[in-house]
A protein has these predicted regions:
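Pocket-lining segment of extracytoplasmic ligand-binding domains
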Residues: 89-90, 164, 171-233
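Short, well-ordered beta-strand elements
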Residues: 28-40, 59-65, 103, 130-135, ...
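Ligand-binding cleft/hinge of the Venus flytrap
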Residues: 46-60, 143-165, 174, 180, ...
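Short beta-strand->loop
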Residues: 34-38, 131-141, 153, 158, ...
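A bilobed periplasmic-binding-protein/Venus flytrap-type ligand-binding module shared by bacterial periplasmic
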Residues: 47-49, 113-123, 217-233
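Immediate post-signal peptide segment of exported/extracytoplasmic ligand-binding proteins
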Residues: 23-33, 53-59, 98, 120-132
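Short, polar/charged alpha-helical segment
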Residues: 37-77, 94-97, 144-152
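Short, low-complexity disordered leader/linker segments with a strong preference
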Residues: 1-31
């Protein structure tokens, strides 16, 4: 089951091609400098890098991976990077800070966030009341997504749930594996990795499904966009 899920995740990543971005991003002597976060926001770059290795790409791409978005933002603003896969909410901030110098090229990540636990106690957002939840992505899309879902469930994110923010998804995973009562919000492929390390771990909530339920019947329903690709003009 784990091999099948991992295969599906990689296949989905390969479906997303960003070849058109090369015409937009600035060229440098060492190629187009791309930054990505460790996790789902970078999975969409797999096809691009595969094409470069096979000699099918139009130019060289230099990919650098980072653990947090705040490591990428200043490099983009300073011109040390040409493109980046970042949390969706940061795109608007970068656009404003650079007076339109950095723009969105594509949406490359939808959803992929899950509430996981070691046990069988959480079945609705209400079940998170009084629990400690390990989350990565403070000030980014993951925080806004969980706050929205908790609020719509009648919970106060600051009072009813103990949100413990971690620097990286890997830190959330470490806390989850170290404590049998821990609950964490993780993206793929970290969920799959966690399931290979803890046999009692289960996906309690699919936040994409929870988000979509809240959009039903709305005047302007939206999708949970978690990652985009941005580039300098």
């Amino acid at each position: 089951m784990m091999k099948k899920l991992t295969s599906l995740l990689l296949s989905a990543a390969l479906m997303i091609s960003l070849l058109a971005c090369g015409a937009f991003a600035a060229k440098t002597e060492r190629g187009v400098r791309i930054a990505g976060l460790k996790g789902p926001t970078t999975m969409g770059l797999v096809n691009l890098l595969d094409m470069e290795r096979s000699g099918k790409a139009s130019q060289h791409y230099d990919l650098q991976l980072y653990g947090a978005a705040d490591e990428i933002v200043p490099k983009l603003i300073k011109g040390e990077l040409d493109m980046a896969a970042i949390p969706a909410n940061l795109a608007a901030t970068l656009y404003q800070k650079t007076n339109g110098g950095i723009q969105v090229m594509a949406v490359n990540t939808l959803g992929v966030l899950y509430i996981v636990e070691r046990g069988d106690t959480i079945h609705t957002a209400e079940d998170l009341r009084g629990r400690t939840l390990y989350v990565s992505g403070k000030g980014a899309t993951p925080e806004y997504a969980i706050n929205y879902i908790l609020t719509e469930a009648g919970l106060d994110p600051e009072k009813d749930v103990d949100l413990q923010f971690c620097a990286e998804h890997a830190e959330c995973l470490t806390n989850l594996l170290a404590n049998e009562n821990a609950v964490a919000m993780l993206p793929q492929p970290f969920v799959t990795v966690a399931q290979t390390k803890a046999s009692d771990l289960r996906v309690a909530l699919d936040l994409t499904e929870e988000w979509d339920k809240l959009q039903e019947g709305g005047e302007a329903p939206s999708s949970m966009i978690t990652g985009v690709v941005v580039a300098r003009k």
